[in-house]
Amino acid sequence: MSQVAPKWYQSEDVPAPKQTRKTARPQKLRASLVPGTVLILLAGRFRGKRVVYLKNLEDNTLLVSGPFKVNGVPLRRVNARYVIATSTKVNVSGVDVSKFNVEYFAREKSSKSKKSEAEFFNESQPKKEIKAERVADQKSVDAALLSEIKKTPLLKQYLAASFSLKNGDRPHLLKF
């Protein structure tokens, strides 16, 4: 059976969409980002803080911790674009980070209910309670990290100090 000709032709040619050859691949981290590296956070609530990099998560974020006891930075996810890796390293082989994954950091769904106008205007935001499980996890990671940090003189003070640029500092010439 031969091809049947179409009943009509379009007056103008319609260009076919260009085929894309892109595929989703896991992000390749910088060579300087290895677990145990001390990082400087560049953005967010804890910008300027020095933290210890623990592991890479499935969603291409980095798991870092202050430790909380030293500089107040809890276990959290950070985008690799917003960190500077320093040459300082901490041994993190004794830290158990196997339980931390993307689901661990997911927010709980809050039930949205209809509010009256009076409740809307006099409502104060309730203080968010931190789960006891999260506190226990933070303490266990901090204990393991602090035992390693204490082995290096002045490392605890280094992590507690925040990073900032002064007048005349040239970031492209600094050795981190």
UniProtKB/Swiss-Prot annotation:
Pfam families: Ribosomal_L6e. InterPro entries: 60S_ribosomal_eL6, Rib_uL2_dom2, Ribosomal_eL6_CS, Ribosomal_eL6_KOW, Translation_prot_SH3-like_sf. The keyword Coiled coil does not apply. The keyword Ribonucleoprotein applies. It is found in: Cytoplasm. Keywords: Cytoplasm, Ribonucleoprotein, Ribosomal protein. Residues 1-27 are annotated as: Disordered. GO terms for molecular function: RNA binding; structural constituent of ribosome. GO terms for biological process: cellular response to starvation; cytoplasmic translation; filamentous growth; filamentous growth of a population of unicellular organisms in response to biotic stimulus; filamentous growth of a population of unicellular organisms in response to starvation; translation. One of its GO terms (cellular component) is membrane. Belongs to the eukaryotic ribosomal protein eL6 family. PANTHER family: 60S RIBOSOMAL PROTEIN L6 (PTHR10715), LARGE RIBOSOMAL SUBUNIT PROTEIN EL6 (PTHR10715:SF0). Component of the large ribosomal subunit. Mature ribosomes consist of a small (40S) and a large (60S) subunit. The 40S subunit contains about 32 different proteins and 1 molecule of RNA (18S). The 60S subunit contains 45 different proteins and 3 molecules of RNA (25S, 5.8S and 5S). Component of the ribosome, a large ribonucleoprotein complex responsible for the synthesis of proteins in the cell. The small ribosomal subunit (SSU) binds messenger RNAs (mRNAs) and translates the encoded message by selecting cognate aminoacyl-transfer RNA (tRNA) molecules. The large subunit (LSU) contains the ribosomal catalytic site termed the peptidyl transferase center (PTC), which catalyzes the formation of peptide bonds, thereby polymerizing the amino acids delivered by tRNAs into a polypeptide chain. This is Large ribosomal subunit protein eL6.
